[in-house]
Amino acid sequence: MPDSFSKIPIPVILGATGSGKTATAIALAELLDAEIVSADSRQIYKELDIGTAKPTAEERRAVKHHFIDELEVTEPYNAAQFATDAATRIEAIFSTGKNVVVAGGSTLYLQGLLQGFSKLPENSPEVREKLYADLAEHGATALYEKLKAADPEHAATLDPTKTQRLIRSLEILEVSSKTVSELKAAEILKPGFHFVPFGLALPRERLYEKINLRTDEMFKNGFLEEATRLFEKYAPVMRQGVKINALATVGYNELFSFLEGKLSLDEAKNLVKQHTRNYAKRQLTFFRNKFSADWINFAETDENALETAKQILMKLKKANPFC
């Protein structure tokens, strides 16, 4: 990578789901003549549109987005792959003379890109199959306690009910005989860019109100129909034990339970809102603990994306004059 690329400031728009990241990133990208690198672990998948609040076709025509609609639902992908691929993509964008704006809320994607990542072992289908059998027989709590005994530091960062990361952590332990914490303490692979994080802050009550309103809007725009298409397409293979991580997502989880007859539609809708609010709370906790971001009070700009983008640009120019 040319040394000059490492000196170009790259604004990173952080924030909880529903906080206004997409609109702010687009406004900032238009001001900077930039392309957007999306750090969202679900928007990268095709077919997951309404449920992931993917930028609209019009928004993507206005500003080029990367890592949107690039993978099939069944393709596995992780934070280390994203960090590596995003670094390559950023270098390619800089080579065209454009600037870059990073935007997203996927905590591990952002951490890997901004702070580097440890080299973790490849997936082992045999070990994963055994662990999923253990999960079915003993339940998530038993597996979480097993991880907690071996790696309490890493276990404390996990939600015990989210089995995807739990299984992966135990898989790493069995494959490498080392814990995730031990591997993370080893050599960190860091992209050599100058990232400048900005966070979008809203009063919690307002954020939760926006999440509830956005969820209602998603259902008006056809979220149930989208989930039904995905359920009809992928449920048969999932019933055979095939794990599709992309569909283990807030919104789709609850609607799949409705389609299986386990919940009423109203119950599913309310759970989507509740689980999205819970996720937003975890995102904010992670961002504040892990990143030294300049937090912008989104309410002070009346939640106006352009005004917020101008404020970010002013701060960016003051600290890093480049445009």
Curated annotation (Swiss-Prot):
It catalyses: adenosine(37) in tRNA + dimethylallyl diphosphate = N(6)-dimethylallyladenosine(37) in tRNA + diphosphate. Pfam families: IPPT (PF01715). One of its GO terms (biological process) is tRNA modification. Its EC number is 2.5.1.75. One of its GO terms (molecular function) is ATP binding. Keywords: ATP-binding, Magnesium, Nucleotide-binding, Transferase, tRNA processing. It is an enzyme of class 2 (transferase). Gene3D superfamilies: 1.10.20.140, P-loop containing nucleotide triphosphate hydrolases. SUPFAM superfamilies: P-loop containing nucleoside triphosphate hydrolases (SSF52540). The keyword GTP-binding does not apply. Catalyzes the transfer of a dimethylallyl group onto the adenine at position 37 in tRNAs that read codons beginning with uridine, leading to the formation of N6-(dimethylallyl)adenosine (i(6)A). Monomer. Belongs to the IPP transferase family. This is tRNA dimethylallyltransferase. It comes from Chloroherpeton thalassium (strain ATCC 35110 / GB-78). The lineage of its organism: Bacteria, Pseudomonadati, Chlorobiota, Chlorobiia, Chlorobiales. The gene is miaA.
